[in-house]
Amino acid sequence: MERFRWQVAAVAAVGLALALEALPSVLCWLRAGRRQQQRPPRRQVLFFPSQVTCTEALLQAPGEAPSGPPAGCRCSLPHGESSLSRLLRALLAARASLELCLFAFSSPQLGRAVQLLHQRGVRVRVITDCDYMALNGSQIGLLRKAGIQVRHDQDLGYMHHKFAIVDKKVLITGSLNWTTQAIQNNRENVLIMEDEEYVRLFLEEFERIWEEFNPTKYTFFPQKKTGTSLPPQVSCFGQLVSCHSKCSHHLSQV
């Protein structure tokens, strides 16, 4: 009986020692959880035109975006933060998914960021306007070539949305077209925010358009309307696609 008591006491002592050893880690975990719960949702406003800065550190890093310039960078541009670099950081924070719904997309830096996310295994889906994706300088052809899913409209109205959803948690939206002209010259705004309700509404809109623009539903030779002729066709990445009156003034640029 005495021996049994000693065994119980020994087991209790070992258990107490292990518990005391694990206590700091448990406390850290609890504090981290409390901080996470108390952390206010993200709210960030970016204004453009953006200062021209070097973005190579952001676009070459394989993982987390570094805070400083890449080692040995000889770029003469400033290496500080700018509206463009903050937008890139918000995009490159994606770990699982990225939905893009954009009217015009020709910025090389933003295009590289999207391709980088695709290479990291992030699921990227893009919705865009059929006319502007066919203009010289558009990033859409490069994204498709990289294997990224792209869908576009085929109607008379513009697909004029300008928003992105990161990991189905962060909404990026505003007046900014993702073009060098808009980034460097135009007065524009971008709102980056974590808000479950707004993200849900924008995600529902994305999914609705994504299904509407399913290629199996395309009509490449729409029926002739009364008193009108068939819309002209334009070469779009090796394919002839119907191009309605909204884009006829752009045909010379394709």
UniProtKB/Swiss-Prot annotation:
Single GO BP term: P granule organization
Residues exposed to the Mitochondrial intermembrane side: 1-9
Role played: Presents phospholipase and nuclease activities, depending on the different physiological conditions. Interaction with Mitoguardin (MIGA1 or MIGA2) affects the dimer conformation, facilitating the lipase activity over the nuclease activity. Plays a key role in mitochondrial fusion and fission via its phospholipase activity. In its phospholipase role, it uses the mitochondrial lipid cardiolipin as substrate to generate phosphatidate (PA or 1,2-diacyl-sn-glycero-3-phosphate), a second messenger signaling lipid.
Reactions it catalyzes: a cardiolipin + H2O = a 1,2-diacyl-sn-glycero-3-phospho-(1'-sn-glycerol) + a 1,2-diacyl-sn-glycero-3-phosphate + H(+)
Family as reported in the entry's similarity comment: Belongs to the phospholipase D family. MitoPLD/Zucchini subfamily.
Regulation: Single stranded DNA (ssDNA) hydrolase activity does not depend upon, but is stimulated by the presence of Ca(2+) and Mn(2+). MIGA1 and MIGA2 increase PLD6 self-association affinity and affects the homodimer conformation facilitating its phospholipase activity over the nuclease activity. MYC induces its expression and stimulates its phospholipase activity.
Protein name: Mitochondrial cardiolipin hydrolase
Assembly, per entry: Homodimer. Interacts with MOV10L1. Interacts with MIGA1 and MIGA2; possibly facilitating homodimer formation. Interacts with GK2.
Domain named PLD phosphodiesterase: residues: 155-182
Region (Required for mitochondrial localization): 1-43
One GO cellular component, as annotated: mitochondrion
Enzyme class name: hydrolase
Membrane topology qualifier: Single-pass membrane protein
Membrane side Cytoplasmic: residue ranges: 33-254
Active site: residue positions: H160, K162, D167
GO molecular function ontology, one term from the record: RNA endonuclease activity, producing 5'-phosphomonoesters
EC number: 3.1.4.-
InterPro entries: PLD-like_dom, PLD_domain, PLipase_D/transphosphatidylase
